[in-house]
Design a protein with these regions (language model features):
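Peripheral, non-catalytic segments flanking oxidoreductase cores
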Residues: 1-161
Length: 162
C-alpha cells in the first residue's frame, strides 16, 4: 500500500484550525468509518498539534537513543512493560502457525504510557498500570508529558464524530 492510498481526513472542524475548509462532524464521521472499515487506518490533517511540539518530542527521543547503552539500561522495561527495550532483546510471535518466534526484533524503544496515581479509582482496574521509567535526559519527561497530553486530547476529539 502506498502513501497515496492511505486516506487523509481533515479534522479542522474538530480542532478549530483555520488552515483548511472545515468539514462537519457528519462528514468527518463518514470518512473515518470508510477509512476504518476499508484500509483500517488514516492520516489526520489539521490535528492541532504544533510542529514545534512534534519536533521537540522527536529531538527528546533522539537524545535518549543517542545515550550510552549503560544509561538507557537504567530505565529498562519494568514489570508493567514501561521503559527501555534494547535492540534485538525481544521477539514477537506474529502467527499461531509458529511455535515460537525465530529471530529477535530489530527494535529499540522506550515505552511510556499514561500514568495514573495509585489512588485513582481506575488504577487497579487497568491492566499493566504502573509507573513509567523516566530517563535522566534533560527535558525528556516534560516534553513527552506535553506530547502525551496533546495526543490524548486529540484522541478524545477524534471520538466526537463517532
Amino acid at each position: 500500500m502506498s502513501n497515496a492510498e492511505i486516506p487523509i481526513i481533515d479534522i479542522a472542524a474538530l480542532t478549530g484550525s483555520d488552515q483548511a475548509a472545515p468539514q462537519g462532524l457528519d462528514q468527518i464521521a463518514e470518512k473515518m468509518h470508510t477509512a476504518c472499515t476499508g484500509t483500517g487506518f488514516f492520516y489526520v490533517a489539521n490535528h492541532g498539534i504544533s510542529k514545534d511540539l512534534v519536533a521537540e518530542v522527536f529531538e527528546a527521543n533522539r537524545r535518549f537513543h543517542a545515550s550510552p547503552l549503560e544509561d538507557k539500561m537504567r530505565v529498562k522495561r519494568n514489570a508493567w512493560h514501561r521503559g527501555y527495550t534494547p535492540l534485538a532483546s525481544s521477539t514477537l510471535k506474529s502467527s499461531a502457525r509458529f511455535d515460537s518466534a525465530r529471530l529477535p526484533n530489530l527494535l529499540e524503544s522506550i515505552s511510556i504510557r499514561n500514568e495514573l496515581s495509585p489512588d485513582d479509582p481506575v488504577y487497579k482496574k487497568v491492566p499493566l498500570q504502573g509507573p513509567n521509567e523516566w530517563p535522566d535526559v534533560p527535558g525528556f519527561r516534560a516534553t513527552v508529558e506535553r506530547y502525551v497530553a496533546a495526543v490524548t486530547a486529540l484522541g478524545v476529539k477524534l471520538l466526537e464524530p463517532v
